[in-house]
């Protein structure tokens, strides 16, 4: 083995000269208390803080000294609407720290300013957020154990920790499909929809378009839908897809839904022998809050549209215009890649622009044999042996049931559900483009084989939700995403050779910039550079260690720094933090 092929095994790299060390020591007061900023990432605003004063400090013995300490710190936060911030003691905790409360909610920047000012008091030992903790959720649905996509293997969605942070509450997912049947494990999450099938024969309800999105059944006899096409029973496809998105969860019954706090608007476009492009285009417009002549407005415009449907050919002008309109109204459009085991470039509407095209994976984390593939795939998701809500009828609706289906039709609603989770916790609604970037940047590499192209990887629900809560896009993104001082970006991952890029601007007088990576699996290499993006050969700091525990420390760092994580080997679950 040549020396060039050996990886360096070094400690963290510190860019520090002797004179710089002297000035650093002078700039960092020995009495400064510890500031725990991790809690800032748990919510968008904060109002209560825990301040630990040193033994023997006057603030512990004198209420007036405590009041003075709090008022001094509060003055560091700019006034709002002409009113200075108030900060008062609530009570002393059993272990001695003081619980204090601001008289208004503080955003993260304000909270950090306050915490640092509190810690500057020589009497203070530490400051932390009085953050809100939650019970961890394992739903009690009786068939959850059969839903491998919601399990704990690295082939699944990594959704259980995401459910502790988000349920999709307040979001709407439009399922453009065969309509829906009544199901006790689904009904509570269904809003009023619409039947857009204009042909009475296809619709089977005898009256064309109407406000009843019920699935009448899509069965057909041999040769009825074309010469040589065998007979088929009703699929209840829309009911299955809707259950994957938002089945009622934690109800001691049946299955769980990806975004079980979300609501579903069923939009019927597929009936006997399929559905027309013209009907589907109108349905996209309506579902996203657009106007369709002669049709009442949608009272619940969707943040997300799921289309588990498709056909051959290039993306038509009609379909593309409908999708573009939906995206312009802020609706993310998620589409099944198709089940032809061929390049997605030949599958409409997955080959349209402005959609998230989803390939299907197996429980082993490999591309499903039937799934379409190619450079047009954006992400992958579980699609094989997916258990969801169904109906027992072979033609017309019978009783509610459950069944497992295979297909990219099953993968797509998993992604639509994750989008609902993301939008439900984002500080402000993300644009469809930002949603796509976030999903790609937080995706996990397939643990199994994929030939032909499976996009950025398997959607990682927890990483996506965490990135949304933190107001970021999870990494990557060409020009880089902005890091917040002291706030970790978690759940990062990339395939071998890929990279994630960030920036952070450090104000003058900050003393030291420390950038760290930690946790997870695989091997991510950290690069930091002042003023421009680092490369393999140009950087200010590159620890170049095996694994993910790397640190760059830079003194007198005012200015913009570019941070790069490059996958020496596929990594996932990595945390990145920059602080000054």
From Swiss-Prot:
Peptidase S8 domain: residues covered: 147-465
Sorted keywords for this record are: Disulfide bond, Hydrolase, Protease, Secreted, Serine protease, Signal, Zymogen
Q: From which residue to which does the signal peptide run?
A: 1-32
Q: Kindly list the places in or outside the cell where this protein is found, as annotated in its UniProt entry.
A: Secreted
Question: Where's the active site on this chain?
Answer: 177, 237, 409
What CDD domains has UniProt attached to this entry? Peptidases_S8_13
Gene3D superfamilies cross-referenced by the UniProt entry? 2.60.120.380, Peptidase S8/S53 domain
Q: Report the record's Gene Ontology biological process terms.
A: proteolysis
Name the Gene Ontology molecular function terms of this record. Answer: serine-type endopeptidase activity
Q: Which InterPro entries match?
A: Peptidase_C_arc/bac, Peptidase_S8/S53_dom, Peptidase_S8/S53_dom_sf, Peptidase_S8_Asp-AS, Peptidase_S8_His-AS, Peptidase_S8_Ser-AS, Peptidase_S8_subtilisin-like, Peptidase_S8_subtilisin-rel
Among SUPFAM superfamilies, the record links this protein to: Collagen-binding domain, Subtilisin-like
In this entry the propeptide is located at 33-136
What are the annotated disulfide bridges? Answer: 225-273, 315-352, 450-454
- EC primary class: hydrolase
GO cellular component labels: extracellular region
Residue ranges of coiled coil: none
Methyltransferase among keywords: no
Report the EC code(s) recorded for this entry: 3.4.21.-
Q: Which family does it belong to?
A: Belongs to the peptidase S8 family.
Q: Which PANTHER family is this protein grouped with? A: CEREVISIN-RELATED, PEPTIDASE S8
Return the protein name: Extracellular protease
Which species is this UniProt entry from? Xanthomonas campestris pv. campestris (strain ATCC 33913 / DSM 3586 / NCPPB 528 / LMG 568 / P 25)
């Amino acid at each position: 083995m040549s020396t060039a092929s050996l990886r360096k095994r070094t400690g963290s790299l510190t860019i520090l000269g002797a004179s710089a060390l002297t000035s650093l020591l002078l700039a960092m007061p020995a009495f400064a208390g510890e500031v725990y900023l991790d809690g800032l990432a748990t919510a968008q605003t904060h109002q209560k803080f825990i301040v630990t004063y040193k033994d023997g400090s006057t603030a512990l013995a004198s209420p007036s000294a405590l009041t003075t300490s709090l008022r001094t710190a509060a003055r560091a936060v700019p006034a709002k609407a002409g009113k200075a911030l108030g900060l008062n003691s609530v009570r002393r905790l059993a272990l001695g720290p003081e619980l204090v409360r601001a008289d208004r909610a503080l955003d993260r920047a304000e909270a950090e300013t306050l915490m640092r000012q509190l810690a500057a008091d020589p009497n203070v030992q530490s400051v932390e957020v009085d953050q809100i903790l939650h019970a961890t959720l394992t739903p009690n649905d009786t068939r959850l154990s059969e839903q491998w996509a919601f399990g704990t293997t690295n082939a699944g969605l990594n959704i259980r920790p995401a459910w502790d942070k988000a349920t999709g509450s307040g979001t709407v997912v439009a399922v453009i499909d065969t309509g829906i049947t009544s199901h006790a494990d689904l009904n509570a999450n269904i809003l009023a929809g619409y039947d857009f099938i204009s042909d009475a024969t296809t619709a089977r309800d005898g009256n064309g378009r109407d406000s009843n999105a019920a699935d009448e059944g899509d069965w057909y006899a041999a040769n009825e839908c074309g010469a040589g096409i065998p007979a088929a029973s009703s699929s209840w496809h829309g009911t299955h897809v809707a259950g994957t998105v938002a089945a009622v969860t934690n109800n001691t019954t049946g299955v769980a839904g990806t975004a079980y706090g979300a609501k579903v608007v069923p939009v019927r476009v597929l009936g006997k022998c399929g559905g027309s492009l013209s009907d589907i285009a109108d349905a996209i417009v309506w579902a996203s809050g657009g106007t369709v002549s002669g049709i009442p407005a949608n009272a619940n415009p969707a943040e997300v549209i799921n289309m588990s449907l498709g056909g051959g050919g290039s993306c038509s002008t009609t379909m593309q215009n409908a999708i573009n309109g939906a995206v312009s109204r802020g609706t993310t459009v998620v589409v099944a890649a198709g089940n032809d085991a061929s390049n997605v470039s030949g599958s409409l509407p997955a080959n349209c622009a402005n959609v998230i095209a989803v390939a299907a994976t197996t429980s082993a984390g490999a591309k499903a044999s039937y799934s379409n593939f190619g450079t047009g795939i954006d992400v992958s998701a579980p699609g094989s042996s997916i258990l969801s809500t169904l109906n027992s009828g072979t033609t017309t609706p019978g009783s509610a049931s459950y069944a497992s289906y295979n297909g990219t039709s099953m993968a797509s609603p998993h992604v639509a559900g994750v989008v609902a989770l993301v939008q439900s916790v984002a500080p402000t609604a993300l644009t469809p483009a930002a949603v796509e970037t976030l999903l790609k940047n937080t995706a996990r590499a397939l643990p199994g084989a994929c030939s032909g192209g499976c996009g950025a990887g398997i959607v990682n629900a927890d990483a996506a939700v965490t990135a949304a809560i933190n107001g970021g896009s999870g990494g990557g993104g060409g020009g880089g995403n902005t890091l917040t001082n002291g706030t970790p970006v978690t759940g990062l991952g990339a395939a071998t050779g890929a990279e994630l890029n960030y920036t952070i601007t450090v104000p003058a007088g900050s003393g030291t910039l420390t950038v760290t990576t930690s946790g997870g699996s695989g091997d991510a290499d950290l690069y930091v550079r002042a003023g421009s993006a680092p490369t393999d050969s140009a950087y200010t700091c590159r620890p170049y260690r095996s694994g993910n525990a790397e640190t760059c420390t830079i003194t007198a760092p005012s200015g913009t720094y570019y941070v790069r994580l490059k996958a020496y080997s596929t990594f996932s679950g990595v945390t990145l933090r920059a602080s000054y």
